[in-house]
Amino acid sequence: DREHTPFRDVTIEDLDWEALLDTRLVFVTGITAALTENTAAVVRHFVDQAHCRGITVALDVNYRSLLWGPERAREVLEPIARMSNIVFCSVRDGKAVFDIESDGEQACRELRELFGVPTVVSTDQINGVYLSDAERGERTFPVVQMPVVDRPGAGDSFVAGTLHGYLGGDVVQGIHYGQRTSAYALTHYGDLTRVSPSELNIPPNTDILR
């Protein structure tokens, strides 16, 4: 479904880098890098420039086997991960792309050690969310199962919520935000989730006020 997207033909010269780099955080995904050699070069250039300027970089590995193989994915994404401040990589993608055979918190820690980055967040479907952080150590966040109306967008919603807290200085709170945002995403059709900060701060299991 991405075969004919115009973005496949983008080049480094096409973009206004001064405008794009006027930001607190640069966020890139493996899906973007996987489309073509052009997009891989654009993503790498973006991260190189952000890293040189001291801008925070976040990478979501988001491996898709229909777009590229694990060897090529690792060749492109590992250098980007090493320049990142926070990396999102599921336990499944850690196994497929980076040969991490462990599970749970250990897998998350091994990814952080491999990349040499401050923070890695790993999801593992219903088994949990794992954090490995240079300052906070390792933590596991249980996943609450719920009825699913429509799944697309839940992963992106989790990352968005987590980055909201991370940019506020608290990645742990960010993961809680991410879980709530992801839960919202599962309750409606479509892959665009709109959640306000006030909704994210509603305590879990709060009763309805009448």
Residues covered by each model-derived region:
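Conserved phosphate-binding/catalytic region of the ribokinase-like
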Residues: 48-49, 100-210
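Structural alpha-helical scaffold elements that stabilize or flank donor/cofactor-binding regions
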Residues: 18-19, 79-80, 113
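Acidic, glycine-rich active-site loops and adjacent beta-strand->loop/helix elements
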Residues: 4, 63, 145
